[in-house]
Swiss-Prot record:
UniProt KW Lyase keyword: yes
Function text: This reaction introduces a second double bond into the aromatic ring system.
Enzyme class: lyase
HAMAP family per record: Chorismate_synth
Provenance organism: Neisseria meningitidis serogroup C / serotype 2a (strain ATCC 700532 / DSM 15464 / FAM18)
A GO cellular component entry from the record: cytosol
Protein name (record): Chorismate synthase
InterPro entries linked to this entry: Chorismate_synth, Chorismate_synth_AroC_sf, Chorismate_synthase_CS
Length: 366
């Protein structure tokens, strides 16, 4: 089955290609009565869109969203919500040299073997341009989660290439082109990215994503554990090569006496679990880290083959991100929001009447 739909109760089906007429999504299962306007969605799209600094692709897209259905008199109706984003700045001539060849590190080779055809213009369906539709859907999910639970989802870049970025405060994230929670290192990062671009190469990135004010109880053991679904969602983002929940791989070097989050009447004493135990949310902040590989489209010539298997040397021309991770924060936020709203609706469907006497201690440590 084609893998274009995400979620079980809050489902999102995306469509479109990088150089097609446009892209978008159909959201089904959104609860009725949510106040929703195009401006609610546009905010996150503007954070993701290309051409916002010299450190990202210079493709100029306004990414203006249109709500085609599912909203009446400013509120969702409970029927499918159709969102459309038109492409306006395609430059397909940049990709003529790869029509009969495969770019190293890209999906060209695998799409060709799977489908027997491919849209080589900007990567077609495999392009990160598709994530604009996910960000649009995620904006709807984020608004519902915030109104229902007060949930706030924040992502920021913690490393670019070999440059680790110190955390100085979330107020800095929107003030620089790196989505960095930092002020003092921005000039250093600017110079570093300029050098990467001039070298005709690219670098990867690491991001941290947090969700605060998540209710306790979300997650469906054993196969639809909340952490498993978050990892699935994050790995579905283009170029993501690694996911950590909570302490992640650092758990290997921790002792059990340190890693296990102790409980007190006043709250948890730590959050090595990343807000999830047994696949179910604890009510603490959900903490996720993702690793993003270097952009595969670079102007440095590399070895490859053509569709007949002949050896070639290929350099990728066009407008590309020297670090695709710099625009990934809104995408990661959106995917986490889509997981949380889907599980919130699933929990409500089965367990809305469940009540226990034990206090929600994660709320008491806020």
């Amino acid at each position: 089955m084609a893998g274009n739909t995400f979620g079980q109760l809050f489902t999102v089906t995306t469509f479109g290609e990088s150089h097609g007429a446009g892209l978008g999504c159909i959201i089904d299962g959104c609860p009725p009565g949510l106040e929703l306007s195009e401006a609610d969605i546009q905010f996150d799209l503007d954070r993701r869109k290309p051409g916002t600094s010299r450190h990202v692709t210079q493709r100029r897209e306004t990414d203006q969203v249109e709500i085609l259905s599912g909203v009446f008199k400013g509120k969702t109706t409970g029927t499918p919500i159709a969102l459309l984003i038109r492409n306006t700045d395609q430059r397909s001539k940049d990709y003529g040299n790869i029509a009969q060849s495969f770019r190293p590190g890209h999906a060209d080779y695998t799409y060709w073997h799977k489908y027997g055809t491919r849209d080589y213009r900007g990567g077609g369906r495999s392009s990160a341009r598709e994530t604009a539709a996910r960000v649009a859907a995620g904006a709807v999910a984020k608004k519902w989660l915030k109104e229902k639970f007060g949930t706030e989802i924040t992502a920021y870049v913690t490393q670019v290439g070999e440059k680790e970025i110190r955390f100085e405060g979330c107020e800095h994230i929107s003030q620089n082109p790196f989505f960095a929670a930092n002020h003092s290192q921005i000039a250093e990062l600017e110079n570093y990215m300029d050098s990467v671009r001039k070298s005709l190469d690219s670098v990867g990135a690491k991001l941290h994503i947090e969700a605060a004010n998540v209710p306790v109880g979300l997650g469906e053991p054993v196969f639809d554990r909340l952490d498993a679904e978050i990892a699935y969602a994050m790995m579905g983002i283009n170029a993501v090569k690694g996911v950590e929940i909570g302490a992640g791989f650092d758990s290997v070097t921790q002792r059990g006496s340190e890693h296990g989050d102790e409980l007190t009447p006043q709250g948890f004493l730590s959050n090595h679990s990343g807000g999830i135990l047994g696949g179910i949310s604890t009510g603490q902040d959900i903490c996720v880290n993702i690793a993003i590989k270097p952009t595969s489209s670079i102007a440095t010539p590399r070895r490859s083959i053509d569709i007949n298997g002949n050896p070639i040397e290929l350099a990728t021309h066009g407008r590309h991100d020297p670090c695709v991770g710099l625009r990934a924060a809104p995408i990661a936020e959106a995917m986490l929001a889509l997981v949380l709203i889907d599980h919130a609706l699933r929990h409500r469907a089965q367990n809305a009447d469940v009540a226990v006497d034990t206090p929600d201690i994660a709320r008491s440590d806020k």
